[in-house]
A protein has these predicted regions:
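Conserved alpha/beta-domain cores
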Residues: 3, 25, 34-36, 74-196
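Extended, charge-enriched "interface" segments that sit outside catalytic cores
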Residues: 1-105
Length: 196
C-alpha cells in the first residue's frame, strides 16, 4: 500500500496516516482485527476441476448434484488431490495455502469467515471445504476445522431455496462434523444481486 501510494502521488497519506497505522501494527500487531475472505463459488469449482483432471474425473462437466455426490465422497476419503506445493496449481488453491501460512504464523483468529459468494447449492459450500482440506485447514478425521464457511445467497431463486439448501447441508455427515468442530454455529449471508 505504501509503495502504491507513493507511486501514485499519495506520499502525504503514506507519510501520515498510513505510517501511523504501520507503527501501531508493528507494536501490537493485528490481534484485534480479523479478515473475512470472499470468493465466488465458481472459482472453487474451477480449482477442483484442475485437481480432478489428472485423475480422469470429469468434474468440470458434472451438474451440481453429481458434483455434490463426488464432493461428499472426497470429503470422506483421505486421499490427497493436490500436487506438491507450487506445481501448476490454481490460484484458488494458492489462496488456501496462503491462508494456512498466515494462520500458522499469526493464529487462527486473524481470519474470520470464508465467504462463498453466489452460493446456489450445497456443492458450492463443500467445494471450498475440500480445497481447505487439501492444505490442512480442514481434516475432519483429525478434528481440525480452522475456518468458518459462510454461504452468501444472492439471487432470488437462491434466496427462495435457502431452507432446503441448508437442510441438505446440515444433513451431510462430513459438514455436520465440521460444524460441530466449529461450535455448531453456521453463519449465512443474504445479499441481493438480481436488481436491474
Amino acid at each position: 500500500m505504501d509503495r502504491s501510494l507513493r507511486a501514485h502521488g499519495g506520499a502525504l497519506v503514506a507519510n501520515g496516516r498510513l505510517a501511523r497505522v504501520r507503527r501501531i501494527v508493528g507494536v501490537i500487531g493485528f490481534h484485534f482485527a480479523s479478515l473475512d475472505i470472499r470468493e465466488h463459488a465458481g472459482r472453487h469449482h474451477e480449482a477442483l476441476g484442475e485437481l480432478f483432471d489428472p485423475l480422469d474425473v470429469a468434474y468440470k462437466v458434472m451438474n451440481p448434484e453429481q458434483r455434490l455426490g463426488h464432493l461428499i465422497q472426497e470429503l470422506n476419503s483421505r486421499r490427497p488431490l493436490a500436487p506438491p506445493h507450487g506445481q501448476n496449481e490454481h490460484d484458488n488453491l494458492t489462496l488456501f495455502r496462503t491462508l494456512r501460512s498466515i494462520m500458522d504464523r499469526e493464529g487462527d483468529h486473524v481470519i474470520g469467515a470464508y465467504i462463498v459468494s453466489m452460493t446456489r447449492g450445497v456443492d458450492d459450500i463443500l467445494a471450498p471445504v475440500l480445497l481447505a482440506r487439501e492444505v490442512g485447514l480442514v481434516d475432519i478425521g483429525q478434528g481440525i476445522a480452522r475456518l468458518d464457511f459462510v454461504p452468501l445467497f444472492e439471487t432470488i431463486d437462491d434466496l427462495r431455496a435457502i431452507g432446503p439448501t441448508l437442510r441438505t447441508l446440515f444433513d451431510g455427515q462430513a459438514y455436520r462434523q465440521l460444524l460441530a468442530l466449529r461450535g455448531n454455529c453456521q453463519e449465512v449471508m443474504v445479499g441481493y444481486s438480481d436488481s436491474n
